[in-house]
């Protein structure tokens, strides 16, 4: 049987094993450590099976295609902005004719994607290969990055400052603190940067990075957003009441408490029928979620809804019914939901922090204060002043064009061409040859 045929049979075996992961999906999304251990064991079995059968990845079978481009991401999570970016880049590279694959320590069971492998299957790399290294938190790739002969391109998504987690999540606080130390310590091992925002570029420069750093936003396949939103959600909440929405993981740096406080002020003074939808995954036992429940009680806010873990088409439905997108986050490396709100023509009111002004690029409404009454006044103007609202949406539509798939695709491919050329120059220098003019 030819190698590609063996690979096809092997992929089916892996797919069958992946079905066993599905039954663990709910608990996995809740970050159950025991369950993650079970999944790692299953993935180890896949690795052992691969070795036993003598299989080779498609990536290895294309070893003669130069350059091969691999992406490293600590974990490939379902619905995660970093994972989505890695998958979108993979599809883009495949479409451009590159031999490419993603290597990771763990893959979410909902992700059924070819050429995604456990890191144990990483083949030997050469100076002709290119690594795109996604970084958002401490991971186990540092030794590989520091020792590889391949060209290393850092796709930096930023690390949440650990102080945000203090008092809420000790584990996250430790991981993020180690992550900041780790990323700073790898500055001499990185050859090139393609970061997702100017804020992230400045962050690396402040850490002492001296390699060339380009900015290319997260690659968003907007065709995915054209599917039909969840009809039940749209029908239930299209009743004439004002729907305020924020989308993001329920974590402290997103400052959900400030969203709730501003909503409560708006509801009390301007619109008693308004509702607030806080769309993001959480566990009811999380200390931060419990804190938010206390905030809601203290504010006396009613109609605050946490939809919880929902399907993608349901997330689209909440964007569809949104009258205003309210973001009070204090740390973002990019903030994809802002672009999603633009796509759904929802006016944005956002606190001017970190990467948010850069992502909005002069669109939306930036507020410099979190004083609830002042933010509520801005919200009310957006809702009541038709001309003002129309101007906001017009600027958001213009800004959205900057994130067009083909535009960002071109930017990333251009940067990869530069990396490829710099790699050839590097090899020539190592061989003592003169560079061509």
Can you describe what each PLM-predicted range is?
Residues 365-372, 381-386:
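Conserved acidic donor-binding segment of nucleotide-sugar-dependent glycosyltransferases
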Residues 309, 317-322:
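Short alpha-helical donor nucleotide-sugar binding micro-motif in glycosyltransferases
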């Amino acid at each position: 049987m030819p190698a590609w045929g063996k690979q096809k049979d092997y992929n089916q075996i892996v797919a069958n094993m992946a079905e066993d992961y599905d039954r663990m999906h709910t608990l996995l999304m809740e970050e159950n450590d025991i369950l993650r251990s079970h999944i790692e064991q299953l993935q180890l079995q896949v690795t052992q099976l691969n070795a036993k059968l003598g299989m080779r990845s498609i990536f290895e079978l294309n070893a003669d295609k130069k350059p091969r481009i691999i992406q490293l991401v600590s974990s490939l999570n379902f619905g995660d902005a970093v994972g989505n970016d890695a998958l979108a880049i993979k599809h883009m590279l495949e479409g451009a004719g590159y031999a490419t694959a993603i290597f990771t320590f763990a893959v979410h069971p909902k992700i059924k994607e070819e050429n995604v492998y456990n890191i144990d299957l990483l083949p030997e790399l050469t100076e002709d290969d290119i690594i795109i290294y996604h970084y958002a938190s401490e991971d186990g790739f540092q030794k590989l990055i520091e020792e590889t002969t391949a060209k290393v391109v850092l796709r930096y998504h930023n690390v949440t400052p650990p102080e945000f987690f203090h008092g809420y999540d000790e584990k996250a606080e430790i991981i993020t603190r180690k992550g900041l130390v780790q990323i700073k310590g790898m500055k001499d091992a990185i050859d090139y940067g393609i970061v997702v925002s100017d804020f992230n570029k400045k962050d690396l420069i402040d850490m002492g990075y001296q390699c060339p750093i380009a900015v290319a936003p997260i690659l968003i396949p907007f065709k995915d957003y054209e599917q039909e939103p969840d009809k039940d959600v749209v029908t239930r909440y299209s009743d004439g009441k004002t729907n305020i929405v924020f989308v993001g993981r329920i974590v402290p740096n997103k400052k959900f408490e400030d969203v709730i406080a501003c909503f409560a002020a708006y509801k009390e003074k301007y619109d008693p029928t308004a509702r607030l939808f806080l769309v993001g995954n959480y566990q009811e036992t999380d200390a931060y979620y419990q804190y938010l429940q206390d905030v809601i009680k203290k504010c006396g806010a009613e109609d605050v809804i946490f939809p919880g873990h929902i399907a993608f088409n349901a997330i689209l439905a909440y964007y569809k019914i949104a009258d205003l997108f309210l973001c009070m986050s204090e740390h973002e490396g990019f903030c994809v939901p802002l672009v999603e709100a633009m796509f759904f023509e929802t006016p944005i009111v956002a606190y001017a922090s970190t990467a948010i002004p850069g992502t909005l690029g002069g669109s939306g409404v930036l507020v410099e204060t979190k004083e609830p009454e002042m933010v509520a006044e801005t919200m009310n103007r957006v809702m009541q002043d038709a001309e003002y609202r129309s101007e906001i949406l017009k600027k958001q539509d213009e800004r959205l064009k900057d994130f067009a798939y083909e535009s960002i695709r071109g930017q990333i491919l251009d940067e990869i061409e530069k990396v490829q050329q710099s790699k050839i120059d590097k090899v020539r220098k190592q061989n003592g040859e003169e560079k061509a003019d």
